[in-house]
Amino acid sequence: MQDDLFGSPEAPTPPVPSRHSTRPTKADAPEAAEHAAPPAPRKRSSQVTAMAHDDALTALAAALPRQLRLGTSSWTYPGWKGLVWEGEHSDTQLSKQGLAVYAQHPLMRTVSIDRSFYRPLTVSQYESYASQAPDDFRFVVKAPSVVTDALVRSEDGRGRQANPAFLSPELVRSECVEPALQGLGHKLGALVFQLSPLPLAQLDRLPLLLERLRTMLLALPALAPTAPDGVIAVEVRDPEWLTPDFAAVLREAGATYCLGLHAKMPPLQAQLPMLRALWPSPLVCRWNLNPVHGPYGYEEAERLYAPYDRLHHPDLPTRSELASVIAGITRRGQNAFVTISNHAEGCAPLTVRGVADEVAAVLAAAPR
């Protein structure tokens, strides 16, 4: 049953996609285009308005299970014009008005609030986000790095010294869980603790860190009274965490594993034993970075993919495997929170559409 639920444990190694864009190059354009007058500068609108979506997109959304909440990592990307909103808009405009428009997209039923990772947010900030989303929308919140990073880091990301606040139960409650619960209320979906890569000295003491994590998780207030769909999830960036002992800690605390699709981690199939060990449990997945860029390839992905208006490296095997996991879990009544970064394939809204197509196809092919 569980092999069917989470997909086959064996999967072929995905081919490395081409590094070339899926759009035609200038050399492919008609010769006359070289002599065309440059387009007039486009004026930015003062109001962000939603794209009019076609019937096919609306039908696709209706074919997806209600337990599935697909979305992106943040929403303030001007390059999403024509996909999520109309016209040209600045980052500042989208920061203020973009969420309400984003939440009107038929496929976008969640979003990851990534800025909370860099600095704790206040109750009023969370309340502002909640007020811009419909009642059925759910937020994925990243716990601040002040409690999820074992190191205090410099501006360039290098670790300088041990972080005394790492996994502090008191700070986690006051700086993360309580503000998110109070501000988002029932719209809180997944609260994700992304544990940053550990120095080698700490990896050698992983049993001690597991006990520290256990203490922190057990000290957290229950989410369900305020947020019935709320779930605590732990994401890691070191494969050494993926052990039965880690699964036991999560199970005891009523938390789940965040499936992290990132070049620092093993591929999706290799992480499925963690999901099996915690079953039944909601799915929380963050698709972060295409492996073609390597484990430290964020800057390379940003340079290549910006302004995030098209797909550059479609990862069709990962889409297919993820869709199978989503379909298996939601068919059995569990929620699924899946957020996708622009760094996954180049344009998060298009990847969301691709995953949605795959999920709909899996469900349509399943015996009834």
Regions found by a protein language model. Give the residues of each.
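Residues lining hydrophobic/aromatic ligand-binding pockets adjacent to catalytic sites
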Residues: 1-368
